[in-house]
């Protein structure tokens, strides 16, 4: 356009990339809606089978809705190129495995459960240069990346939270830190008690 003529020598490429989509994920949970049986040996001379799982008829696909807004910029005949993107991703019916249940059901855990809702949002910047210095067979170019992601557990069943959090004792043997899952915090956050001083 005529009103952009001033940019011809500076901006060699400019593009915007808005996207939106919804995806489903079974997370390996396919088939859990069926009752399965396995051999349990023999009884009174006859083969015996036993249930090997609980039928999970209410299990849903994990669903992720995401939007992205990005742009590509090239400067000085693409001597410098940049890509910038912001995103917001919400996952509902989050799939988690091996959640403990009362053994009165005949099993101590469920293979999969729909655990809650989690959100990831953030931004990312990539930049690079064309070959701007060349000496003989040696050439130089620069590339860089910087990004930031914010993760938040928005909803989760109290029983599942209890199962995930488990022990609250720091283990000095293998230097493992306490990780805790709490609503309105990042999944697997490292936590500790506030110090009142040394005495």
Task: Set out the residue ranges of the language-model regions.
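Short, intrinsically disordered, charge-balanced linker/junction segments flanking boundaries
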Residues: 193-199
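Extracellular/periplasmic, surface-exposed regions of secreted and cell-surface proteins
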Residues: 1-185, 190
């Amino acid at each position: 356009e005529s009103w952009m003529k001033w940019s011809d020598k500076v901006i060699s490429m400019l593009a915007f990339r808005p996207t939106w989509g919804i995806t489903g994920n079974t997370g390996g949970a396919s088939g859990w809606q069926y009752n399965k049986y396995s051999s349990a040996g023999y009884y009174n001379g006859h083969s015996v089978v036993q249930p090997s799982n609980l039928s999970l008829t209410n299990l849903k696909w994990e669903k992720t809705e995401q939007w992205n807004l990005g742009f590509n910029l090239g400067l000085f005949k693409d001597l410098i190129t940049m890509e910038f993107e912001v995103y917001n991703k919400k996952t509902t019916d989050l799939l988690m495995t091996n959640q403990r249940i009362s053994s009165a059901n005949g099993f101590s855990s469920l293979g999969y459960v729909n655990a809650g809702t989690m959100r990831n949002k953030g931004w990312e910047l990539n930049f690079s240069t064309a070959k701007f210095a060349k000496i003989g067979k040696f050439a130089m170019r620069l590339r860089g990346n910087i990004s930031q992601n914010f993760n938040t557990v928005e909803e989760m069943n109290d029983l599942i939270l209890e199962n995930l959090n488990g022990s609250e004792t720091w283990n000095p043997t293998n230097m493992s830190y306490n990780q805790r899952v709490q609503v309105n915090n990042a999944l697997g956050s490292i936590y500790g008690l506030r110090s009142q001083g040394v005495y």
